[in-house]
Amino acid sequence: MDITIQHPWFKRALGSLYPSRLFDQFFGEGLFEYDLLPFLSSTISPYYRQSLFRTVLESGISEVRSDRDKFVIFLDVKHFSPEDLTVKVLDDFVEIHGKHSERQDDHGYISREFHRRYRLPSNVDQSAISCSLSADGMLTFSGPKIHSDMDASHSDRSIPVSREEKPTLAPSS
């Protein structure tokens, strides 16, 4: 099968809002018609974008919330088990690392690895941080904020990932 290379001057109808899946974290998870023939699918039906936002919403994008009382990170890690995840607090950062060895899926064999690093607000009580993984693969990292009259404790430590049996509701802004 011959696949033409897309020239840099050729832009998709929605530009950067419509990312290609050929070279991102979806590599190896199967291709859609618009991945191979983006100009053809937009020419035939410019309003037909079956999975335009599905890939964005399911891409492992994290959401960070910092309100008056707590600091929370939501991260989609549906391809990882708690044993595959390492969560550490180092200085004023939280580091989340996931890695699983090669395993078989619908499209062949795949191994995955990611590393995310987030800066913690200075008023997060690092001794009270918790981390859990829901049944639908949403990792929730949370730490309470302390008020200015109390002193935040800072130390390097690993945070255990506990498993929850119920799915996490999709984070809403």
UniProtKB/Swiss-Prot annotation:
Q: What is the official name of this protein in its record?
A: Alpha-crystallin A chain
Q: Where in this protein does the record say N-acetylmethionine is found? A: 1
How does this protein assemble?
Heteromer composed of three CRYAA and one CRYAB subunits. Inter-subunit bridging via zinc ions enhances stability, which is crucial as there is no protein turn over in the lens. Can also form homodimers and homotetramers (dimers of dimers) which serve as the building blocks of homooligomers. Within homooligomers, the zinc-binding motif is created from residues of 3 different molecules. His-100 and Glu-102 from one molecule are ligands of the zinc ion, and His-107 and His-154 residues from additional molecules complete the site with tetrahedral coordination geometry.
Give GO terms: molecular function aspect only.
metal ion binding; structural constituent of eye lens; unfolded protein binding
Q: Which residues carry this modification: Deamidated asparagine?
A: 123
Q: N6-acetyllysine occurs at which residues?
A: 70, 99
Ligand binding (Zn(2+) 1): 100, 102
| Described function | Contributes to the transparency and refractive index of the lens. Acts as a chaperone, preventing aggregation of various proteins under a wide range of stress conditions. Required for the correct formation of lens intermediate filaments as part of a complex composed of BFSP1, BFSP2 and CRYAA.
Looking at the record, which segments are called Required for complex formation with BFSP1 and BFSP2? Answer: 1-63
Q: Which residues are glycosylated?
A: 162
Q: Which superkingdom heads the taxonomic lineage of this protein's source? A: Eukaryota
